[in-house]
Amino acid sequence: MVADSAFLDNSYIKSFLSNQILSDSQNINFNDLENKFASISHVQDVAIYKDLIGNLNIGIKQYIPIARIVSGSLSDNYINDEGHIFPISSRYSKRVLLLHINEKFSKDKKLTSSKFGKDLLNMINYINDDEFFSKIISELEINSSKNIVIHPQFSKQKIIFGYPDDLEEKFEKINLFYNKIVPAKGWNTYKTVNVKFKNQIICDKS
């Protein structure tokens, strides 16, 4: 039995399998076949075995995207929650946080190879794990100085976040803006909201 997954459905897996084993289904090298499946860029882990009645079982764990890089040297790639970078697919697209990155990370396809990459990943996971922020934040813009600007989903202002640190404090200020200031002043009164400085929230109309 072959389990469906987002990037690799039954049809794709069966076609890939038939191309690998051809007509000799009785003499399958499972390690070799697992390695061939593992070489597919969207596969995180794979286990292949035969059950007691001879059925071939394939279990595939795919990478689950949590953000998509849409600019910079790594554009057209997804990121998973552990920082693995893998390509988008024509077979499947998931709506996730968009990243405009002006920072070149490592060549080993791992976001966590640098301190900034680890801190950025922590911020992305923080957003995705929060019910409120995951709904209102659609894009992150990362400049060459490693400062981040948040682009909300439903309003026009930019939120200047700065370096992805002090997450609890900065997101609490963003929460304060949307729950206290916006109801009093309106959604699009301010063009920028700056939360990068400690103990300050600066709202600018210009």
Segments the model singles out, each with a brief description of its role:
Residues A38-Q44, I127-I136, A184-N188:
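Short secondary-structure junctions
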Residues I58-E139:
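Extracytoplasmic segments of membrane-associated envelope/inner-membrane machinery
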Residues M1-Y92:
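Terminal hydrophobic membrane-targeting helix
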Residues V2-A3, I60-I64, H100-E103, P152-F154, ...:
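Flexible glycine-/small-residue-rich
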Residues F161-S206:
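Extracytoplasmic/luminal low-complexity segments enriched in Pro/Gly and acidic/polar residues
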Residues G54-L56, I85, N147-I148, Q200-I202:
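Hydrophobic residues embedded in beta-strands of well-ordered beta-sheets
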Residues F105-K109, S113-N175, N179:
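Soluble extracytoplasmic domains of inner/organellar membrane proteins
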Residues L8, I28, D51-N55, G72-L74, ...:
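Extracytoplasmic
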